[in-house]
Amino acid sequence: MKRREFIRTAGVIAAGTAVARDLVLGRDLLPGILLSDKKPNIVFILADDLGIGEVSCYGADNYMTPHIDQLARGGTRFTHAYTPSLCGPSRATILTGRYLFRTGATNQDSTGRMKPSVETMMPNILKPAGYITAAIGKWGQLPLDPADFGFDYYLKFTGSGIYWNTQAKGKTYLVNGEEKVLHDKEYMPDVMHQHVIDFITKHRDKPFYLYYSMSHVHTEILPTPDSTPDSKDNYADNITYMDKLVGKLIAELDRLKLRENTLIVFFGDNGTANGKADRATIGGRRLAGAKGSMLEGGSLEPLIVNWPGVAPAGKVNHDMVDSTDFVPTFAEVAGAKLPRNKVLDGHSFTAQIHGEKGKPREHIFIQLAGMWYVRDAAWKLNQAGELFDMSNAPFEEKLVAADTKDPAAIAARKRLQAALDQLNPAGGIKDDGDGTGRHANRKNKE
């Protein structure tokens, strides 16, 4: 039996089915799926402030990403993958599989209030299934360490966009609680990469989950080790270097003979930053919005999955995916059990990774601060009751008149409003911030 056929037929119970309902049953767990006699490694690569307009396999006009493109050619590229448009809230959904009105991580500051006694993150789901886990890189706005949320090994730095020790927050970093000095001429992305390689080399005989949160391409944009003295485009240099590191990781997995048993997922934490969005064009067109907005340019992300012998090569998938979906997907892939004491909003897309139809989402949900929307393949409805025609997305979002007589628009409003009513974000944890998603109300900040 071929490996892909064995994996597909060995499933018992679909752990990744959406469980968006209260299941307050202590710490009981849902059964997972035993996918293989040798559990696959999971490598999750999270780029910072990278939108689809900066990845060449998505049609970017001004940037080339050959190694990321190679991942797409050898796997599946998703065209409708969404996440909250700022890094802290985005990472909260990625690691918990829960929407922001449930966790309270509705703005950057409030993300830091998440507690391991309340929220179960990905490592504590995978470890009982036999996985060793690591978080290497940016650790969002969380004041607690990755170890507090279950990671066995971690490297973290303070702030965002750390590259050289000339930066105010670039002097030191932490490895498993021990402070390390970033020395002169050491490049933080290279330091992180070496820790990635050391981790996978040390644990190559045991299934591992790697949460690799890159510095690139968050500001402050500085020259890379490969930038020439006369370089006029440090931003493009940074995208190129990020892509180079992805290629080096793939090469190392090949060298260690781990590629055939490793699921690689490449994703972005939010869209392109405002100052860079004008150049992040596709076919000469700028995306609507940018990082921090409630438009496509803020939340539509590159999502590429690659798993030799399992994920079919060169496939493009148009199903809706959002960032809560990684938790149930990785649990299903790992044969792990999902928590039953919390509502989990994610839908597993493991079937799509296998190249099968599966049961795709009908819509995704995105929130930032007190703003939210549901979006399906053609329409979007926000918290203000505004309906948008998304037929020209991601470049244009056309507001539909409230009194429209268009039967399709009327049906879409009814359908999406029912989805919002079922989720009831207004009944969840209220945002206490300044309305932008960037800061909590300073009077209420813990």
Where are these regions (language model features)?
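Formylglycine-dependent sulfatase
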Residues: K2-G385, M390-E446
